[in-house]
Amino acid sequence: MATCSAYLCCPATSASLKKRVFPDGSAGFLFFGGRRLSNRLVTPKSVIRADLNSMVSDMSTNAPKGLFPPEPEHYRGPKLKVAIIGAGLAGMSTAVELLDQGHEVDIYESRTFIGGKVGSFVDKRGNHIEMGLHVFFGCYNNLFRLMKKVGAEKNLLVKEHTHTFVNKGGEIGELDFRFPVGAPLHGINAFLSTNQLKTYDKARNAVALALSPVVRALVDPDGALQQIRDLDSVSFSDWFMSKGGTRASIQRMWDPVAYALGFIDCDNISARCMLTIFALFATKTEASLLRMLKGSPDVYLSGPIKKYIIDKGGRFHLRWGCREVLYETSSDGSMYVSGLAMSKATQKKIVKADAYVAACVVPGIKRLVPQKWRELEFFGNIYKLIGVPVVTVQLRYNGWVTELQDLERSRQSKRATGLDNLLYTPDADFSCFADLALASPEDYYIEGQGSLLQCVLTPGDPYMPLPNEEIIRRVSKQVLALFPSSQGLEVTWSSVVKIGQSLYREGPGKDPFRPDQKTPVENFFLAGSYTKQDYIDSMEGATLSGRQASAYICDAGEQLLALRKKIAAAELNEISKGVSLSDELSLV
């Protein structure tokens, strides 16, 4: 693997320069391809830290209490048998918490691989195919806690503390959070000094943010979060424009961010979703700091979690899908799950447990909920949530696409070079992308080959019906428009992954329909990033939902034991009736 992957390559070789005036009105020089020269002294970046012992936000203080719950008390109730449907991050998070409390856990997954939306697999040619592009904010304390617990704390690479925008023609804009003083001054400096917006737009942007609940978050994080929740009914665009923000700011900066967060633009995303992130960026210095996995999620995220679960006695059952949730109704009208009808190819079986957790995505839980349950408002609300289609494209090149400073260097294959970070763009159908050969080199850098761009097409709707060849053609054309210096480089391999419904559409007014992890059915629980938790639909939200689901199950330990005995007694009674009837028939 490329040993230089832990450095930001700043070649000192000659480059073509041209002077120009930037959108903010200032003048400066551009390297070939449009990259702006910083007026700071450029020095080689120190080795990137790959652990979670520093540069992580402390979400236990001066933060909304619900975002990072305290460690659970030691469970002293009865040992429970728990069946979890879904081996995504939410399901595995639930499993880890339950196993740590001494319960027995089985996880059922209909696919041949685990990880859900953060899953990956290896194709016949040895290429790692991901379900999407995964970036870890510095405020992902629940996910970082999980990674530490399972021994994966050294599997993340810290990126430069900037948010980079690639504009048409190779022009680079930045939100540069590198500043001697931390929050909130580092953020104020980043927004006031950004070259992604014109001076007027920056000023109006500052006014809008100054009038937001983000300011209150500095002194009253819980109060600010409630204010932000109250803004769920309006779109971010409507809120932002009402506070003096400009349409240009939305188009050039906030739309790419919104697409990256929720796969929809500012006109369609809830103000709650965007302001939740802004509040964290404003109050926590490292919240905006990005990390990416060393390599593929299956190896560096799902893999360690799976090993931990198995070592703790948990069991995975792959390719077992749930066909039906079986349930009974008590004489008092209450319902409980009596089993899960599972199938694997031609095999079928009924799975029984004390508690059942549906850790599914939105379309998955919709298929799973029995028709009768949908009459309840709790479950009926789920059908008011819909998922967003997304298409993830991987393009392997025979050179380094994002190398803007040195044309000759971009054509060589001996050393990885280019932009090592998450990249946003307002000028392509993919809102965010990264060169995984640089950003996650362990599995994606291949000696003798070049960039592996992973591009997330949002909205994915126009691309869903297109053949893969047409998608590749369109995306590679847009890559060339962003990086003219890549003219002449060839795509040597590609892949396309289409997901019909990924994250739930966090549009205005949808937050009240997110279900709690505890349901009206006594022994049936939910987990998933779409369920009710204080963060947005994300990896962090999925992990947090698993912690909350586990807490509900442990709190209900005694009741679930009583239900187990009740079900056993009812089954024994049915068997007794069957034996009595058999005896009567024998006498006849």
Curated annotation (Swiss-Prot):
Protein's pathway: Carotenoid biosynthesis; lycopene biosynthesis
Gene Ontology cellular component annotations, sorted alphabetically: chloroplast; chromoplast
Subcellular location field: Plastid, Chloroplast; Plastid, Chromoplast
Pfam families recorded: Amino_oxidase (PF01593)
Segments crossing the lipid bilayer: none
Top-level division of the source organism's lineage: Eukaryota
Cofactor detail note: Lipophilic quinones such as decyl-plastoquinone or decyl-ubiquinone.
SUPFAM superfamilies in the cross-refs: FAD/NAD(P)-binding domain
Gene Ontology biological-process annotations: carotenoid biosynthetic process
Keywords: Carotenoid biosynthesis, Chloroplast, Chromoplast, Oxidoreductase, Plastid, Transit peptide
Reaction catalyzed: 9,9'-di-cis-zeta-carotene + 2 a quinone = 7,7',9,9'-tetra-cis-lycopene + 2 a quinol
Cofactor: decylplastoquinone; 6-decylubiquinone
Range annotated as the organelle transit peptide: 1-49
Principal subcellular localisation of the protein: plastid
GO molecular function: 9,9'-di-cis-zeta-carotene desaturase activity
EC number: 1.3.5.6
Function: Catalyzes the conversion of zeta-carotene to lycopene via the intermediary of neurosporene. Shows stereoselectivity toward trans C15-C15'zeta-carotene double bond. The zeta-carotene produced by the phytoene desaturase PDS has a C15-C15' double bond in the cis configuration and it requires isomerization before being recognized as substrate by ZDS. No activity with all-trans-zeta-carotene. The main product is 7,9,7',9'-tetra-cis-lycopene (pro-lycopene).
Subunit comment: Monomer and dimer.
Family, similarity comment: Belongs to the zeta carotene desaturase family.
PANTHER family, A to Z: PROTOPORPHYRINOGEN OXIDASE, ZETA-CAROTENE DESATURASE, CHLOROPLASTIC_CHROMOPLASTIC
Protein name as it appears in the record: Zeta-carotene desaturase, chloroplastic/chromoplastic
Gene: ZDS
